[in-house]
Amino acid sequence: ADTGDGDFITEGGGVR
């Protein structure tokens, strides 16, 4: 997963 505050790996976000 990428970094960010998205849901799972969608919206360019990562798992937080």
Curated annotation (Swiss-Prot):
Keywords: Adaptive immunity, Blood coagulation, Coiled coil, Disulfide bond, Hemostasis, Immunity, Innate immunity, Secreted. Conversion of fibrinogen to fibrin is triggered by thrombin, which cleaves fibrinopeptides A and B from alpha and beta chains, and thus exposes the N-terminal polymerization sites responsible for the formation of the soft clot. The soft clot is converted into the hard clot by factor XIIIA which catalyzes the epsilon-(gamma-glutamyl)lysine cross-linking between gamma chains (stronger) and between alpha chains (weaker) of different monomers. It is found in: Secreted. Disulfide bonds: none annotated. GO terms for cellular component: extracellular region. GO terms for biological process: adaptive immune response; blood coagulation; innate immune response. Heterohexamer; disulfide linked. Contains 2 sets of 3 non-identical chains (alpha, beta and gamma). The 2 heterotrimers are in head to head conformation with the N-termini in a small central domain. Cleaved by the protease thrombin to yield monomers which, together with fibrinogen beta (FGB) and fibrinogen gamma (FGG), polymerize to form an insoluble fibrin matrix. Fibrin has a major function in hemostasis as one of the primary components of blood clots. In addition, functions during the early stages of wound repair to stabilize the lesion and guide cell migration during re-epithelialization. Was originally thought to be essential for platelet aggregation, based on in vitro studies using anticoagulated blood. A long coiled coil structure formed by 3 polypeptide chains connects the central nodule to the C-terminal domains (distal nodules). The long C-terminal ends of the alpha chains fold back, contributing a fourth strand to the coiled coil structure. This is Fibrinogen alpha chain. It comes from Mandrillus leucophaeus (Drill).
